[in-house]
Amino acid sequence: LPCFPFAKQLGCSPNEVAQKIVDSLELDIGEAVAVGPYVNIRASLTWLANQINQKPEPKGSILIEHTSANPNGPFHVGRARNAVLGDTFVRMHRAAGYDVTAEYYVDDMGKQVGILCWALENLDEGRVHSLLDEGGITSEPSPHSEKHDHARVLWYQAANLLKAQDASVDAGVTELVQLSEEADEDVLNRFESAYQPVLDGMLETLGRMGIHFDSFTKESRFIVDGSVETMMEKLESSELHGVAENGAHFLELESKGVKGKSTQFFYRRGDGSSLYATRDLAYHQYKWTQSGRLMNILGEDHKLQSKQVGIALEELNIQPPEVVFYAFTKLDDGKMSTRRG
């Protein structure tokens, strides 16, 4: 404790203030010592042991969603950072007496899974290695080559390279994704067959770090059960609602403090289908049925979307979650990328 602010008010030196404070203190936690103009308080080992062994009072439930990385390849250090931070919050809240649910939101119907599925169904191993060699991405065996997340990411990377050369690849992936957004059971099953071994490999990696999840929720759940469609219909009654020339629906958020070029939050495409963020609305509505408090751990690149989703949730009379953002580190040779290996 620095005593400089008190010295002028009391009309004596900071050193004298520090000593007077120490002389007047009666501490249960240990001892106080005056060190020049500072007061140092030292907790005794007995007090610390009692605090650690003391069972905290129950504080209610909290669902902490973290990691939720696309199941298209192994963790790189950037994606794993979310898991470490998220698990830290899980452990801290458990230690503080909360009933914590560690949640993983599985992106089981997006473009990344669509690319992986298309690649596994259309590319053989020889074609994959040929494409990777041409693209300068190593496909040499590694100590982890047998793990499905390390093995299948090669197909994902190869398909991305081929997509840049062959428009039919993008068309094929787009068709799969569109069918998944229509809750096509066959396509969703094919997607799961493609990504589940990858997700299992990713979870094995996290398990070695002592990171585990209590629940997994698939994004497609909210398409299949109709809750996304219900959300979109409700948003049409919002005063913020608008329709673009191509028939897409959006909320105009400028009046809510969103600035810049992205003041419109699009939630329905012109063809009537939903977007990822729309499904996020239904997901948060569901999460509130599972817990009395919600927390999301996100990278700072999600700040705008998180704010947009929060405003949309308020328009639906749903409380937004607490969000913890973490910053990124710039690397000399560019961003970490699963697609580029």
State where each predicted segment sits:
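NTP-dependent nucleotidyl-transfer catalytic core
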Residues: 1-341
